């Protein structure tokens, strides 16, 4: 990688990370990966223009979308909103045992034409199709880096052997392994699971060897403070922020949660105090 490429990567990463080195990124790939039923709690958010307009107005640092959603709603982004385009995905229409592969659904040059600041792809470490996703990621990373664009790996350990040996995919040992694998395959940013404690997540951050690690937001919590506490622990563990979908778009008014997350991530505010300040409790 020459100096021009590395400068391009660093500059584009700053589209997501503030001066504190942290980011709050809104995830909008659920309609494809989980299906439109994910939007049933607040049905108007099935319209990407509506929800993206809301989250951008509330102040998220970046938005992650699939290429088609960018075409539908990309003009809702502000000039300073980071755009992450994900180039792999899968549906939940296939049998569960066949959902251990994310296929490539676009190319780096397509994402760049759409205005991407970063390119993302998923690898299910431990899947029987791990080698396919590893090759996809390697090709995406090589091409993106050649053009000076950062790559983000959604490093998700999952597969029958993981379940058999560790009991769950969130076991810190496999999450740590996935984060290290992401770093060693060239990721500039890593999105991964919560491991259940600040102490174990700190080991995940250490294993990533300096590559920023962001929390995968997961399912919506009934109590917003519970989620804010997890994000607080991620930050305390040295994590670089969170990529959040359902804990935002499954709320009638997502703005208070976004602003509370900003308080926790960027201002180091106590989760309960942040929730009170934004009227969540």
UniProtKB/Swiss-Prot annotation:
E.C. numbers: 4.1.2.13
Write down the chemical reaction(s) this protein catalyses: beta-D-fructose 1,6-bisphosphate = D-glyceraldehyde 3-phosphate + dihydroxyacetone phosphate
Q: Which GO terms describe its biological process?
A: glycolytic process
Q: Superkingdom of the source?
A: Archaea
The record's subcellular locations are: Cytoplasm; Chromosome
The GO terms describing molecular function are: acyltransferase activity, transferring groups other than amino-acyl groups; fructose-bisphosphate aldolase activity
Activation and inhibition = Activated by citrate.
UniProtKB keywords: Chromosome, Cytoplasm, Glycolysis, Lyase, Schiff base
Q: Where is the active site?
A: 191 (schiff-base intermediate with dihydroxyacetone-p)
Classification via InterPro entries? Aldolase_TIM (IPR013785), DeoC/FbaB/LacD_aldolase (IPR002915), DeoC/FbaB_aldolase (IPR050456), FBA_class_1 (IPR053414), FbaB-like (IPR041720)
Q: Keyword Lyase on this protein? A: yes
What the entry lists under SMART domains is as follows:
DeoC
Q: What is a single cellular component term in the Gene Ontology annotation?
A: chromosome
What is annotated about its quaternary structure and interactions?
Homooctamer.
As for family, the record states: Belongs to the DeoC/FbaB aldolase family.
What protein name is recorded for this chain?
Fructose-bisphosphate aldolase class 1
Species of the source: Thermococcus kodakarensis (strain ATCC BAA-918 / JCM 12380 / KOD1) (Pyrococcus kodakaraensis (strain KOD1))
Q: Which gene encodes it?
A: fba
